[in-house]
Each structure stands twice: as structure tokens, then as C-alpha cells.
């Protein structure tokens, strides 16, 4: 799937929150606080997202219903891998170093990361 714009990502976040198809009016209502969109603008972005393979539009009824074709987890993996490859030469260590040096990691984050790595080590995983 092609990379999503910030606006497309915001739409996906709303779709991921729902376990059922969502109408464009529902999307517009739920995104109202974030963006001051008109319905036509939203429809244009949704059409672009469908072309990218991010959403499916069910047109079998009078009202169009939209569902995410990519799970939130799949998108995070794709984007995270892309960032790691492009910016950090595939080095998780360099990525973590950047987070730490830029004060993006709290003591709690560090503790949780240590616990996670210990768990992986105890299981014999990567």
C-alpha cells in the first residue's frame, strides 16, 4: 500500500476505531473537531484512499459505507519499517538512541523496553 497523507491517516484512525462499515457522514462528524472539512473534500480523499488500496467503499445500498482494508497493526509495521530503513539504515539501536537523546523516552519507556527485551531473551527469540 502507498504511504498515506496526514489527512488520510486521520481518516484511517476513525475507521480503525469501528468494527463495522462507516458512512461518510459518520466520518465527517467524528473528524469535525480535527478538520473543518466539507463533505465533498472528504469524498475526494476517500476516493484517493480507495485507489491506494487503503479503504473499500460498499456502494450496494443508497448510502456508501467505508471500511479499512489495512489494519492499524499492518500500517504501523509498514510505516515503522520504512522509517527504520530510510532514516536509520535498518538499525533499531540508532532509532532508540535518537529517541533517548531527543528526550522522547521516559524512564517508564526505558523500563518497559528493558522488560520486553528480557522477555524476548528468556523466550529465546530475536
Regions found by a protein language model. Give the residues of each.
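Short, cationic-aromatic polyanion-contact patches
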Residues: 3-5, 60-79
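Short acidic, hydrophobic short linear motifs in intrinsically disordered regions
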Residues: 21-30
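Short helix-coil junctions and helix-kink-helix linkers
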Residues: 29-37
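Short, hydrophobic-biased segments on the C-terminal half of alpha helices
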Residues: 43-47
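Glycine-centered, phosphate/nucleic-acid-interacting loop/turn motifs that mediate DNA/RNA or nucleotide
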Residues: 53
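Conserved segment of winged-helix/HTH DNA-binding domains
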Residues: 71-96
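C-terminal regulatory/oligomerization modules of transcriptional regulators
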Residues: 101-126
Amino acid at each position: 500500500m502507498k504511504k498515506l497523507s496526514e489527512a488520510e491517516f486521520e481518516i484511517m484512525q476513525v475507521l480503525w476505531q469501528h468494527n463495522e462499515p462507516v458512512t461518510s457522514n459518520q466520518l465527517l462528524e467524528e473528524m469535525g473537531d480535527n478538520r473543518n472539512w466539507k463533505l465533498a473534500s472528504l469524498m475526494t480523499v476517500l476516493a484517493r484512499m480507495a485507489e491506494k488500496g487503503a479503504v473499500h467503499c460498499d456502494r450496494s445500498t443508497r448510502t456508501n459505507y467505508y471500511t479499512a482494508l489495512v489494519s492499524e497493526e499492518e500500517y504501523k509495521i509498514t510505516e515503522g519499517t520504512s522509517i527504520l530503513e530510510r532514516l536509520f539504515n535498518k538499525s533499531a539501536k540508532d532509532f532508540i538512541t535518537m529517541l533517548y537523546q531527543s528526550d522522547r523516552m521516559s524512564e517508564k519507556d526505558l523500563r518497559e523496553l528493558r522488560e520486553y527485551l528480557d522477555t524476548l531473551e528468556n523466550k529465546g527469540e530475536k
